[in-house]
Amino acid sequence: MRGNARGPRPNVANPGKLLLRLLSYIFKNYGFACIIVVICLFITVFSSVQGTLFMQTLIDDYIIPLTKQASPDFTELAHAIGRVAIFYACGVLASFAQSKIMVYVTQGTLRNLRNDMFIHMEGLPIRYFDTHPHGDIMSTYTNDIDTLRQMISQSIPQVLNSAVTIVSVLGAMIVLNIPLTIITLFMVGVMLYATKVVGGASAKYFIAQQRDIATVNGYIEEMMNGQKVVKVFTHEEESIADFNKLNDQLFESADNANKFGNILMPINAQLGNVSYVLVALVGGILALEGAGGFTLGKLASFLTFNKSFSQPINQLSMQINNIVMALAGSERIFNLLDEKPETDDGYVTLVRAKKENGQITECSERTGMWAWKHVHQADGSVDYIELKGDVVFDDVDFGYNPDKMVLHNVDLFATPGQKIAFVGSTGAGKTTITNLINRFYDIQDGKIRYDGININKIKKDDLRHSLGIVLQDTHLFTATVMENIRYGKLDATDEEVIAAAKLANADTFIHQLPDGYNTLLTGDGANLSQGQRQLLAIARAAIADPPVLILDEATSSIDTRTEKIVQDGMDKLMRGRTTFVIAHRLSTVRNSDCIMVLEQGRIIERGNHEQLMEEHGKYYQLYTGNLAE
């Protein structure tokens, strides 16, 4: 079970480089839209600055002179206000357009990221999914993507707006009065220092919060998948205790992150008020004395700029939290995208074929015959080798980690039509051998040949297309029964689907479902029994009509009565095909042509049932022990 050990707080590596990569990704797909957003942003800021500068003109050139006139004429004032109103209207329209375009850019970027992530994930090797918690991967698609949504739609536009506003307002303040500008800049420096201290303290906790959320999601998924085991062993209290530890860890990181993050804006707001008071005090004295031509109108404009100058600083400090969280999420997203995809240096492909006058040729029509198309790299000549299902392991060594071998000197051969069974205790290497046939993993030493061809030369998609597999853990997709069976051969007709179901003896129970073959399965087929789910998996393998079958404990979860029904169909399916079977019930492999007994990654016995029983070795012990049960 998981403990509550806490390591050092994680940090985002190269945040600047990460931010640049994210911005490049956005601009690559929506560059023109981003340019329009920046233009709209400049128009918005320009209209705001012009409106503030007009305040000086309004007071000094219109209001004060008009108060001194006996019969004031407001015509020129009305014209001036009209011109400013046009500026403000342009700013409002630009701000509206900016918001609309950013929604489009944000949602489009997230859609592209999800697409890129999923496409890339589908190309990753099985090793990645064996070594990364599925909850962590799911958190990347949900929580991390959501933090990016906030950053792209809110933080980035706000940061740009604030930056342009700061530069524009600073220029206007310098023009109005340099001493007051120096006071304002000094207070801004104090605010930036506060932002650095408080923001730096919160950043590490926001990063940890993202990691802790992924950990909690992973644990919840783990417990959901293992609920039966939890209840059988009455481990509810232990699982709750472990969850509470992880949840408390998440609470601690989230509490610390928001504790620091939430005080940053109030601190800067109060410092902004101090700046405003200082400027008002000094500026009032300058205006009353008329020093340097400083007027009440200029003071009014400067005070507004002072607030406008501190406001973007506050907004920047507020967005720091979102940016840090988003960078932590984007780091995980780009880590997924940077994972090396499954390599495939094979060049031998599987093609439809026909045989005429003893010669195998490639064709496009369905003939029921397949062949390996071997284009020799040396001279470009082409050989066609009939797909039969001849599999040979030649002195194979393999380890999931190179420094720890799990298979040693494995030699085996299976000719077309043979049924090869692997037996042995858990962890002996039975399933590993089938993983190597699929090239889910590549061997460290030795050779595996398929119809005389080294499987490293065969393209992985074509290799796997030639194999029918029933995995130990049956997985059904959210689709109809017919679509789940058709997954083994996407262009199969309805008649072929039904024929495969009959072969697997699944047709009877399918007709008993509410909508028969059109019954929608959800939740991994949760409304079906384990035996029914396994029958559908066998039908899925049957429809592929492969020359080689891999049955990884295909009947180990089926009751005895169902097993007999399945076995009858499987015997028909296996006829004429090379079949590798792994089963704990040794009675299901008695009729195998060859039984191989594995122990600690080595084949220690081989032969048919009668031969192995006569040897009184490991197989004899397993078999008699099985009967004794």
Kindly label every feature range from the protein language model.
Residues 117, 121, 230, 333, ...:
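Helix-loop junctions and hydrophobic alpha-helical segments within the transmembrane domains
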Residues 24, 32-57, 80, 84, ...:
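Alpha-helical segments in transporter systems
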Residues 1-48, 63-84, 98-102, 106, ...:
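Membrane-integrated ABC transporters
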Residues 65, 172-186, 256, 260-331, ...:
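Helix-loop-helix
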Residues 126-127, 145-152, 156, 160, ...:
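An intracellular "coupling" helix at the cytosolic face of ABC transporter transmembrane type-1 domains
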Residues 70, 353-629:
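ABC-type nucleotide-binding domain
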Residues 8-16, 47-63, 87-134, 138-142, ...:
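Juxtamembrane helix-loop junctions of ABC transporter transmembrane domains
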Residues 29, 33-46, 154-208, 279-294, ...:
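Transmembrane helices of ABC transporter permease
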